[in-house]
Amino acid sequence: MLDVAIIGCGVVGAAAAYELSHYPLHTAIFEAENDVADCTTKANSAILHAGYDPEPGTRMARLNVEGVALAKEICARLDVPYRQCGSLVLALSPEELPHLQKLYENGIANGVPGIRLLSAEETLAMEPNLAPTVVGALYAPSAAIVSPWEYALAMTEVAVRNGVELRRSCRVEDAEAMADGGYRLTTTQGTVEARYVINAAGIWAEKVHCMVEPASFHITPTRGEYYLLDKSEGTRVNHVIFQCPNELGKGVLVSPTVHGNLIVGPDAVPVHGDDTSCTSKGLEFVKTTAQRSVPSINFGESIRNFAGVRANLDVDDFIIGEEPEAPGWIDL
């Protein structure tokens, strides 16, 4: 019997495996795809957020601040590309300034280091390629960028070297609680038993949870489309550039990458399952919206478009832990 079965090997499952590999446990990862980091982890904005957006007192507020600092340590330890470039949230009209003030107050309450409000002049001095209509910004120097797939791969490699078993192309198809504790998992590679299960299945986490009991949370898979631009555009901005967030997320961002490119996106479109298709409508929206922040981006230097699907929860916080009706089953 396994001590711990981890379902999913994106960055969350990889991090769980990495930490557990430091203990004398029999741990195995079950990844449905043919390699790790093959879903949301390989197709996202690659941002480590500073922690000013979550409501104070939430898990997200605490773990954003702790996580960006911890990720810096882990990336250095594992030789993963990482750059603490800081972020700017722009106010593009006077009406958006109160929202920046709210984010600033959140950041102070959450303990975000070095956070401050900037005037239009200060903002343009830091980023001269921004739209001249910018009226202010929120600066968070602790925000960073990373290579998310290399991050997940590095943690998985260490975990496997430390004895964690990795089963790729191994989809969990059913799960049931056993009478004497633990869970029996039916996979495409046979049946296994585990004392504890960590559900890190990303957009499929609700479906996986419902194998053992009805989920108390709901996930809406949400597609985001991106432009990746040539390195000739990589210095167009030096910080992660956000627009004021809305109910769909943090909006369309413009950011350097750790490999010297420029990334622009995403939009936010609810989809069924893992639909990662790009659309002319979505890409036009991303382009037009991004130009409100950085009008001089040369989209003729685009070298690739891609889309990723992220798990949008119906609660404004991370889900970490087990429910009373499913002891030993831990959702991440």
Predicted segments with their positions:
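N-terminal Rossmann-like FAD-binding beta1-loop-alpha1 element of flavoenzymes
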Residues: 2-28
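Helical element adjacent to the flavin cofactor pocket in flavoenzyme catalytic cores
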Residues: 138-196
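Short beta-strand to alpha-helix junction loop
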Residues: 62-65, 90-99, 138-157, 167, ...
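C-terminal catalytic lobe of FAD-dependent flavoproteins
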Residues: 249, 258-259, 274-332
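Glycine-rich FAD pyrophosphate-binding loop
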Residues: 22-42
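Dinucleotide-binding Rossmann-like beta1-alpha1 core, especially the glycine-rich loop
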Residues: 46-126, 135, 251-252
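Flavin (primarily FAD) binding-site architecture
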Residues: 199-214
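Mid-domain catalytic core of redox enzymes
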Residues: 213, 225, 231-262, 268, ...
